[in-house]
Amino acid sequence: ARRLLEAMNITVLETEGYEADDIIGTFAVHAPPEAEIIIVTGDKDELQLLNDRVKVYFTKRGISDIKAYDVAAFAEDYEGLEPKQLIDLKGLMGDSSDNIPGVPGVGPKTALKLICEYGTVENVLDNIDRISGKSLKEKLENNKEAALLSKKLATIFTEVPVELDLAKYELKAMSEEARPLMQELEFRNLHERFQTILGGSDGLFDLFGESVGQGSTGTAVEFLETQEQGADFFAI
């Protein structure tokens, strides 16, 4: 993967000890205030980063089905909550895919109801006596530390020591090595799609030397091109 990305002149950014979420979150928070940011991901954790200049394109099924999230779309899906409250939801309901335990026995519906009413995990735990249902009260009372830890685990770290000069990460035309490498890897369609977006050293040609039309884009690429051509920072 790294060899291919290098041939496509796409910057690969990694920092030891930090996850990709943390690096993306750092850019989302610390990019210049005028920058518009798009995050393409299959991980809903990134939704906590949504604000007026950050959008998330969530890949629901591979790259063939994408849902665009802004703050309003998030509120529609989460009963009016703000994106920053996603970590409170995860604090209660957990997330097995990220090894976040949550409160055992508290599912998404109950967690959403509690956060809608009390706002944060901390407020839920401070108001256990007011919550109806003996069983739910016991679950919350017996798992306070797990809830607080889960919220912390769900929170994206946004202070990763990375270079924040966006000019260094601008997309460039693909190198001469890109086409033969994609041919070797049998990525015919991928080459055509990225040629349309990025261009290349020898024009728009497919892997077999035939001219490629400008409209030769796949579902995800076409979506991204038509939705947000003016984005300043784009992360996958």
Regions found by a protein language model. Name each.
Residues 168-236:
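Long, highly charged low-complexity segments
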